[in-house]
Amino acid sequence: MVQTKHFCMLHRTLLCPKRIKFLQSISKLKRHITQIHAFVISTGNLLNGSSISRDLIASCGRIGEISYARKVFDELPQRGVSVYNSMIVVYSRGKNPDEVLRLYDQMIAEKIQPDSSTFTMTIKACLSGLVLEKGEAVWCKAVDFGYKNDVFVCSSVLNLYMKCGKMDEAEVLFGKMAKRDVICWTTMVTGFAQAGKSLKAVEFYREMQNEGFGRDRVVMLGLLQASGDLGDTKMGRSVHGYLYRTGLPMNVVVETSLVDMYAKVGFIEVASRVFSRMMFKTAVSWGSLISGFAQNGLANKAFEAVVEMQSLGFQPDLVTLVGVLVACSQVGSLKTGRLVHCYILKRHVLDRVTATALMDMYSKCGALSSSREIFEHVGRKDLVCWNTMISCYGIHGNGQEVVSLFLKMTESNIEPDHATFASLLSALSHSGLVEQGQHWFSVMINKYKIQPSEKHYVCLIDLLARAGRVEEALDMINSEKLDNALPIWVALLSGCINHRNLSVGDIAANKILQLNPDSIGIQTLVSNFFATANKWKEVAKVRKLMRNGAMEKVPGYSAIEVNGELRTFLMEDLSHHEHYHMLQVLRNLKTEIRDVCSGVE
């Protein structure tokens, strides 16, 4: 009798929906969930209370029982928007975007009106698979149901556009939004930064500040990336100072971004200091430092960092290995480059980015055939892949092969861009193919509607000047109003020196001085021209300018790998312990070359 009374009291207690919800929230085992499920079925609560059904599904999802959650969902005789949303959340947390989209379609088919949460989560599911078309269809439906100005829905659409590379669409939508929160602003800043549109990222950040929104860590990360891409040291250091002053947590992601930013703006020593002070380092952190060394021409340090990284148990990822390949390219370390190639094939799947880095490395190390072999094995070749191979042949001055590759690229329905034509024109310039260079320059403008940049004009002027057609090159400079482009005048002056055209060279040299170059190399070129023309007053003037500017030419150097060790030789460096022996070897080689040449004649 007492037991029956106790059971009845317990039964009445559990009939309260709040009690059931409490039990669901603290249940961490499947058997507890199934017991509650059985109880609510027996009491009819599953039929009468949609909140209980929703919470039961959520409880299943919380403990990872996705299939059981779906079983509960499917057995419900009636399903409202809250129940659908609960099941969608379970699939979202379980990283199953396809099921989210199927549930959304089922919901629409059953004529159940979605709410803000439904649209937001469904668009996020489209983002997971970068299904832009489906995402736009969901967005249209959201507009139809009156969620055009819902900040959560709009924010998810902005994110989808950004991740799918639809920057213009994102900007248009952002401009039409009636209300914007900090998440929307952050999405725009970080989206443009990650897409390499750093100026836009900074522009939106400044607008964000003007609107009175605070700066969080995510925005700061976007700004650090933009600072590095733009080479804006002042902004990068300002962000670093802000992070320090405000006491925002300096976790490994923030510190790695600082290393990356300082390396990109050329402050590699600061990047090294930030890295050395990091409490925790990841493979990504090491990759940023190694890439930084490579970008700043410190190949030896890049190699040393890779060795240290591996000794500490970190395995380099593809980003790190690309940085090592860049270092190999700088010093012509073919042996190390091949080792990296083998490591990639053994540990990673070769993607297009890494393949192009390998092609570039082999080309700069003199193994052009290896570059072509990798190129041929790339499955779906994109524009970057074609441009890289064209550039590889261009470096070696193989103009005819560049033209052949260009034609194959267009036959593959790949549209060339400004970089393609820059490589094409450069190769033709080094090959001395003037008529072909002029032809393809015209094709670029008339057929592909690409407006020539300064780089294209430099290639064409260099092409004409190398061939001795300096008057024609000068006419082009004047007709195209290129008189303020320093690299163009330098290319013209080089041609004048080679072909001893003193009249045009005098014009070019004086124009270069008017543009006030800060490069000691360019000033030396001008001085050498005046010396060739016996204009010693002008020579003295240029040399005085060089002294007054307190400019010091960075000595040229060459590097070669000998028995696995990198040897570097500085110009006019007499400190090497085998200096005199090397000079003797060079003299012997010079004698042998002279003998061979005289024999050929």
From Swiss-Prot:
Region Type E(+) motif, annotated ranges: 564-594
GO MF, any single term: RNA binding
Keywords per UniProt: Mitochondrion, Repeat, Transit peptide
Transit peptide residues according to the UniProt entry: 1-80
Localization, UniProt: Mitochondrion
GO BP terms in the entry: RNA modification
Repeat region (PPR), residues: 49-79, 80-114, 115-149, 150-180, 181-215, 216-250, 251-281, 282-316, 317-347, 351-381, 382-416, 417-452, 453-487
Highest taxon above the source species: Eukaryota
UniProt keyword Repeat present: yes
Keyword Mitochondrion on entry: yes
Regions that span the bilayer: none
Family annotation (InterPro entries): E_motif, Pentatricopeptide_rpt, PPR_At4g14850-like_plant, TPR-like_helical_dom_sf
GO cellular component terms attached to this protein's record: mitochondrion
Region (Type E motif): 488-563
PANTHER family, per the entry: DYW DOMAIN-CONTAINING PROTEIN, PENTATRICOPEPTIDE REPEAT-CONTAINING PROTEIN
Entry similarity comment: Belongs to the PPR family. PCMP-E subfamily.
Protein name (Swiss-Prot/TrEMBL): Putative pentatricopeptide repeat-containing protein At3g25060, mitochondrial
Biological source species: Arabidopsis thaliana (Mouse-ear cress)
Organism classification: Eukaryota, Viridiplantae, Streptophyta, Embryophyta, Tracheophyta
Gene from which the chain derives: PCMP-E96
